[in-house]
Amino acid sequence: MEKVFKIFVDFDGTISKQDIGEAIFRKFGNPERVENIIEKLLSDKITAKESWLSLCESVENLDKNELNEFIDSIDIDETFCNFVDYCKKNEMELFVISDGFNYYIDRVFERENLKDLKYYSNKLVIDSNNKLVPSFPYLDHNCTSSANCKRNHIINNSGEDEYTIFIGDGNSDKYTVQFCDFIFAKDDLLKYCEIERITYFPFNNFNEVTAKIDELRSRKRLKKRYQAELKRREVYINE
């Protein structure tokens, strides 16, 4: 039977070269307050949703044109578009799952001719008082490290006989990887996988990911990650 792979990719710091969400608040928010909020999030003192609400409150009198110019100045990984083509060619469904915001993801994807990519994220609008107003359509209180519950998107978009691949780099991915068969990690996510002894493949760009997936696809026998299967089963039972 032909192997079916479902690919799930983080956005900030994985597709984009910088964490755009964090960079926006560091540039336009109150620096001291922003630093304090991020420290609390990384030390699990507040949830992802609480951090986003506080970060948005730290920004006053935002200039929309300045924000757009700033977003436009941040590049994506130059190998990502080729990776998207690779997934299409090999009929592997690709989902972008981000704890960031649709406001800048839409802008980046339009710029890079990637508007057809399916993605899930939090929502962000600029109101009449030039304030950032976030909303969280995919919030799950079990997913405290991500206001957009990435775990649920993975479980809802993959079946028992399909292999799940996750590609990410950061804090919002820590809970997510526990439910995936194959993990590509860098930066903070890589450190987390090492500490928690979760098997992963290190990567620097999507060309390296492509080469490894080719290897996985060529294996005659490919095992799903047992601990991930147990975790997924727990979710089904608890529901």
Predicted regions and their residues:
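Alpha-helical substrate-recognition element adjacent to the catalytic core
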Residues: 2-112, 116-121
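C-terminal cap/substrate-recognition subdomain and adjoining C-terminal extension
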Residues: 79-93, 100-239
